[in-house]
Amino acid sequence: MTERRVPFSLLRSPSWDPFRDWYPAHSRLFDQAFGLPRLPEEWAQWFGHSGWPGYVRPIPPAVEGPAAAAAAAAPAYSRALSRQLSSGVSEIRQTADRWRVSLDVNHFAPEELTVKTKDGVVEITGKHEERQDEHGYISRRLTPKYTLPPGVDPTLVSSSLSPEGTLTVEAPMPKPATQSAEITIPVTFEARAQIGGPEAGKSEQSGAK
């Protein structure tokens, strides 16, 4: 079976920037375990100096003391860490009419994603080229594969990318074969002479003599 590249519909707005959360220096710390603070008391100070738009709320000035500050920062830390760990998580759904895979690819730009089918398998590839920051080098690679259900036409596979960074790949399920209508075939009755033919009639006459 030949390989086919599946184009996906880009549902993001034109102003969307896939690296908008990557620009601040501290916004890349979740990509490396050694960039995280070790103790809860350090979280408050670390988050207070972090430039993470959309991830962490500013710590209220009224909060005093390391324990109170850590308690205020912990929910924000959990949200950010949960978002990081959710990257690459997929969900497969199959109904009588449709087969669908949803994959979180929020860390990849549209031009870094490729969807193709080959030998009844959907292959999704996402790759970041190696980038350097103050902590070292960062690179990502995503290569999940999904086997299409039997009977699914690979040429009908389509994909789309949502504004939230969810890649959806889907295909219609094959329709079950329609059962043919029952047909009764009539049996035609033939006389004995017709069944035996002319030669049979002559044999009977010879026997009578």
From Swiss-Prot:
Homooligomer. Homodimer; becomes monomeric upon activation. Heterooligomer; with HSPB6. Associates with alpha- and beta-tubulin. Interacts with TGFB1I1. Interacts with CRYAB. Interacts with HSPB8. Interacts with HSPBAP1. It holds the Pfam family HSP20. GO terms for biological process: anterograde axonal protein transport; chaperone-mediated protein folding; negative regulation of apoptotic process; protein refolding; regulation of protein phosphorylation; response to heat. It is found in: Cytoplasm; Nucleus; Cytoplasm, Cytoskeleton, Spindle. It comes from Canis lupus familiaris. Its main location: cytoplasm. Keywords: Acetylation, Chaperone, Cytoplasm, Cytoskeleton, Methylation, Nucleus, Phosphoprotein, Stress response. Residues 74-209 are annotated as: Interaction with TGFB1I1. Belongs to the small heat shock protein (HSP20) family. InterPro entries: A-crystallin/Hsp20_dom, ACD_HspB1, Alpha-crystallin/sHSP_animal, HSP20-like_chaperone. SUPFAM superfamilies: HSP20-like chaperones (SSF49764). This is Heat shock protein beta-1. The modification N6-acetyllysine is found at residue 127. PANTHER family: HEAT SHOCK PROTEIN BETA-1, HEAT SHOCK PROTEIN HSP-12.2-RELATED. PROSITE patterns: SHSP. Residues 80-188 form the sHSP domain. The modification Phosphothreonine is found at residue 178. Small heat shock protein which functions as a molecular chaperone probably maintaining denatured proteins in a folding-competent state. Plays a role in stress resistance and actin organization. Through its molecular chaperone activity may regulate numerous biological processes including the phosphorylation and the axonal transport of neurofilament proteins. The modification Omega-N-methylarginine is found at residue 12. The modification Phosphoserine is found at residues 13, 15, 27, 82, 86-87, 90, 102, 180, 203. One of its GO terms (molecular function) is protein folding chaperone. GO terms for cellular component: axon cytoplasm; cytoplasm; nucleus; spindle. Phosphorylated upon exposure to protein kinase C activators and heat shock. Phosphorylation by MAPKAPK2 and MAPKAPK3 in response to stress dissociates HSPB1 from large small heat-shock protein (sHsps) oligomers and impairs its chaperone activity and ability to protect against oxidative stress effectively. Phosphorylation by MAPKAPK5 in response to PKA stimulation induces F-actin rearrangement.
